[in-house]
């Protein structure tokens, strides 16, 4: 099916502001859906169009498979007309600057881990960053068949968890939504880890994920 889309109006040539809401005392408060209002790519992160001030690290995009896929604030472009789901720590105005500059400080500058689970149809990912920023809480996928992997910390589940540098043990939770075989993989985003061991709490088996 081919079609031609036309947009009427004026191209934004200056900064654009959104009002972000946050309702206290409800589950997963502070999530807001915002879009790229410009005709060029933008980025989220320090020094980029969407700064991390008052926002949790990273954001979500809705994939074609119906998964809310977490993205860390790095060199991943937000395309024109693309929407992302961000979490704010307080209600207020968010200014999106008219710039296509990439973040001045990227996730790979820190010690970070990417933990991925996949089957033959879907995949999900969680991140661990040893930093003092605000983590991104895990949300349910639109597609109930997509598996979920997340990091539980202090009674909350995170897609992007922020932990102390001294942390040695990281809890990882996984939910298989359908029967089948799943693959779990771990990647060090900056190659600063010599060994990363996955311990099966049920069997006691462990494996060095950097060698598997």
Question: What are the residue ranges of the model-derived segments?
Answer:
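Compositionally biased Ser/Thr/Gly- and acidic/asparagine-rich
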Residues: 2-212
């Amino acid at each position: 099916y081919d079609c031609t889309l036309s947009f009427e109006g004026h191209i934004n040539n200056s900064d654009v502001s959104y009002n972000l809401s946050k309702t206290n005392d409800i589950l997963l408060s502070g999530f807001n859906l915002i879009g790229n209002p410009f005709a060029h790519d933008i980025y989220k992160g320090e020094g980029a169009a969407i700064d991390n001030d008052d926002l949790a690290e990273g954001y979500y995009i809705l994939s074609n498979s119906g998964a809310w896929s977490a993205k860390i604030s790095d060199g991943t472009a937000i395309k024109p007309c693309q929407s992302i789901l961000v979490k704010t720590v307080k209600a207020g105005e968010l200014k999106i600057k008219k710039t296509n500059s990439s973040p001045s400080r990227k996730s790979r500058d820190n010690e970070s881990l990417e933990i991925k689970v996949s089957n033959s149809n879907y995949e999900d990912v969680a991140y661990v960053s040893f930093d003092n920023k605000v983590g991104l809480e895990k949300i349910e996928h639109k597609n109930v068949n997509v598996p979920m992997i997340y990091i539980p910390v202090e009674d909350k589940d995170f897609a992007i968890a922020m932990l102390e540098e001294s942390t040695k043990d990281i809890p990882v939770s996984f939910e298989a939504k359908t029967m089948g075989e799943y693959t779990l993989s771990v990647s060090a985003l900056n190659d600063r880890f010599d060994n990363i061991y996955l311990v099966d709490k049920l069997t006691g088996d462990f494996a060095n994920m950097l060698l598997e």
